Amino acid sequence: MEMACRVINRRRHVGLQQLLSFAQTGRSFLGPVKATKFITDAECHESVLISSTVRLLEGLDLTCAVGHLLNEAVQAQNNTYKIGTSTLLFLVGAWSRAVEDCLHLGIPTTVIVSVMSEGLNSCIEAVVSLQVPIHNVFDHMDNTSTVYKLETVNATLCPFLQDPSGSGLLQEKRDFKDATSPLLSTYSLSGRHAESPKFFKPQNNLETEKNTLQVLKNNLYTDSFCKKSALAHSRHFNRTDNSHWISRHDGFLEQLESTPKVLRCNDFGELAVGLSHGDHSSMALAKAAVRLQWQSLCLQQANWMAPFMFDISRLLTCCIPGLPETFSRVGLGYVTFVTMSSITLIKELQDQPFRVILIEGDLTESYRHLGFNKSVNIKTKLDSGELSEDSAEELWTNHVLQVLIQFNVTLILVQGSVSEHLTEKCMHSKRLVIGAVNGSVLQAFAEATRAVPVAYVTQVNEDCVGSGVSVTFWMSPHDINRSNRIAILLTAEGINLITAVLTSPASAQMETKEDRFWSCVYRLYHALKEEKVFLGGGAVEFLCLSHLQILAEQSLNRGNHACLGWLPDSSSWMASSLSVYRPTVLKSLAGGWHEFLSAIMCNTATHPSAVEARTFIQQHVQNAIDSGSPSSYILSEYSKLSSGVFHSGISDNLELVPRVYDTVTPKIEAWRRALDVVLLVLQTDSEIITGLVHTEMNSQELDGVLFL
């Protein structure tokens, strides 16, 4: 797919225009209501449905240097956090436009880089006041050895904070049935054992939860403590204490740390719903996976006292297209595919315990472990492509079978590829071989069966063989998909491995469904790992916008920035330039946040046009500035479910409105990477472009408009 068409003025900053063009293609991915796109291969004309920035950039023509740079930034964010790429892409475009506007006004590049970098760092310090601590979200759930039979879990999904329809709560039902663990406890949203094992209460039964919701509302401001800034000694400000100050518009200083009341999240159900971001079905699966891992750990370790840490490496996905979405579920064990030729074998052996060996690497005659030094004096020559009785592979295959027969091995899990000839031989001798097994799967089966992974079959002895593995059909043998494969389930007693089976009637949606599931999983993972989240619904971006406008007004009104500690040792020219241009650059940076919030409101259909959204935002920004404390204003508005600032478009039934949360570090790092990309392109092109002043003087002739 080629880059979205956009007229690029060669007399202006080409790199920034290219960034803006790339970023505009992913605008619809922002917010809880994401519009999907079709990516069509120009050569084979195959199409795939995508709704993520990573998939989008994989399908774009990134032949230019700017495209490669943007893709590297997005890939770095995705490889590290798996979330935040849509925010990164959008802010790259918004801040590219902001930098372009600054260049049109004749602001020096060094000033733009300096002020924008320090402005973002100031925002990052300011939003610390909107962090919500997460404490003991699993403590309310009973971790005793009392167990119950896990029945079908009917998960009626809780509403998202911003339901764009506004006419009712978004509901969707899923059935989650764990066929492999009939002795796991289930818990209600309040943390007690549930008589009816449901991860979420049905909407029509939520009247019984009013007391819980009322407690959450009453505790909104009951906790008081001072949050310390993570950047207490920033190099960008001259501070001698650990306080976090920002300048108010009237010239006084506000100490954000003095905010006496903060939110707190102590319930896992509330946390999961707040991090769903509109994708309730995926979050229901993610939440069920975390609960299942927690329950499994509690059963294995009755006296377990250490805090629970969600091990994301023990969670896998298995995508099965062609089935209704109601078949999606999570359960203990390993779900994978085998060919139709294995159906008869599994039917014969599914009621018997399997003895298993684990192979690290390939199970082929030519495989050698990493670091193996092959002798230079041995040469192998094959006269025919067909295997003969005396060939090396045939001899090797026979030797492998002898080892398997000697130790009565009926299941072989291989991390790499497997010889097709060996697979056929094993099938004839009623032995199942499964290749391309994830390393974490091997480790999980090693722990559960006491098997010892080996590199070669020749290393196998009795101590390396595990036992107690059961193999069953995950779905009916008659439900064969288009690739002529059947899904099977491998389990063992006490195994710490969970598979989320994702189904969809449309094959084109499978990739999108898997991406959204992992996004929900990683939001939960980062939140539980950091033990803190941000207030969501645009609250953090709103505070950044208000904070920058306060700084800009303060700079404009006073003209003397010594109290802020901006570059005290800089040259007189730099100091004078900062004094003149700082308000403009800060407002341009704030414009990126303004555009961000406006795009979310338009995508969620809470406002019919960008003009109305921007007007709505600016009105509340002014209210926040006039209040003297934007952070307190935001916390106050969060306590008013009917305020319409961070709860626009929600249902009229306010008792059913949950809080919205967002991750901390992934969001902040997405901001940093977005600005780094923009400023890097700006500085790189500025070093190789000459005649910049002449170009800007003639911009009126080129564009018809001269920015003043």
UniProtKB/Swiss-Prot annotation:
The parts of the chain that form a coiled coil are none
InterPro entries given in the database record: BBS12, Cpn60/GroEL/TCP-1, GroEL-like_apical_dom_sf, GROEL-like_equatorial_sf, TCP-1-like_intermed_sf
Q: Which GO terms describe its biological process?
A: chaperone-mediated protein complex assembly; eating behavior; fat cell differentiation; intraciliary transport; negative regulation of fat cell differentiation; negative regulation of stem cell differentiation; photoreceptor cell maintenance; stem cell differentiation
> Which keywords annotate this record?
Cell projection, Cilium
In which domain of life is the source organism classified? Eukaryota
User: Which Pfam families does its entry note?
Assistant: Cpn60_TCP1 (PF00118)
GO molecular function terms noted in the UniProt entry? ATP binding
Matching entries from SUPFAM superfamilies are given as: GroEL apical domain-like, GroEL equatorial domain-like
The entry's function note states:
Component of the chaperonin-containing T-complex (TRiC), a molecular chaperone complex that assists the folding of proteins upon ATP hydrolysis. As part of the TRiC complex may play a role in the assembly of BBSome, a complex involved in ciliogenesis regulating transports vesicles to the cilia. Involved in adipogenic differentiation.
Oligomer and partners: Component of the chaperonin-containing T-complex (TRiC), a heterooligomeric complex of about 850 to 900 kDa that forms two stacked rings, 12 to 16 nm in diameter. Interacts with MKKS.
Q: What is this protein called?
A: Chaperonin-containing T-complex member BBS12
- Recorded source organism is Mus musculus (Mouse)
